Every structure is written in C-alpha cells, then in structure tokens.
From Swiss-Prot:
One of its GO terms (biological process) is cell wall organization. The lineage of its organism: Bacteria, Bacillati, Bacillota, Bacilli, Bacillales. The gene is dltC. Residues 1-78 form the Carrier domain. It holds the Pfam family PP-binding. Carrier protein involved in the D-alanylation of lipoteichoic acid (LTA). The loading of thioester-linked D-alanine onto DltC is catalyzed by D-alanine--D-alanyl carrier protein ligase DltA. The DltC-carried D-alanyl group is further transferred to cell membrane phosphatidylglycerol (PG) by forming an ester bond, probably catalyzed by DltD. D-alanylation of LTA plays an important role in modulating the properties of the cell wall in Gram-positive bacteria, influencing the net charge of the cell wall. This is D-alanyl carrier protein. The modification O-(pantetheine 4'-phosphoryl)serine is found at residue 36. The keyword Ion transport does not apply.
Length: 78
C-alpha cells in the first residue's frame, strides 16, 4: 500500500469516518474529527505503523489541520 493510502487509513481509523478519505481538505479540528486525545492516538499510530516519530512538542495544529497537510508533513519527516 502506498504511503498516502497508509496515512489516510490511519486517519480513517482514528476519526472513525471515511470522510477524511473522501475530502482530504476537511478541517479535522474545526469539524470535531480530531481533538487532543485523538491527536495523541494519531501520533502513536503513525509511529507504530509508519515508523515516523513526531514529537508532540513539534506538533503544530495549524500545520496538521487537514489530511492533505498531514500527508505533506509526514512526507517531510520520512
């Protein structure tokens, strides 16, 4: 499975909706799909499944606002 699909699969699992796959520009926090607890779960899943460590202190909500932005941020960390 391609990197992009892996990230979207993780997001779909955490948010419990396929809306993140259908609309990769959806504002995850504004729409209530991610909160602080879900963000921690997301970072743990990313580390476990993609072997990419994202320190919580480096997580900027504005830069991780949409699935598309998350994919871009993670590609930079690969």
């Amino acid at each position: 499975m391609a990197f992009r699909e892996n990230v979207l699969e993780i997001l779909e699992e955490i948010t419990e909706t396929d809306e993140v796959v259908q609309n990769t520009n959806i504002k995850l926090f504004d729409e209530g799909l991610l909160d602080s607890m879900a963000t921690v779960q997301l970072l743990i899943e990313i580390e476990e499944k993609l072997d990419i460590t994202v320190p919580v202190s480096e997580f900027d909500r504005d830069e991780w606002a949409t699935p598309e932005m998350i994919i871009t941020q993670l590609e930079a960390l690969k």
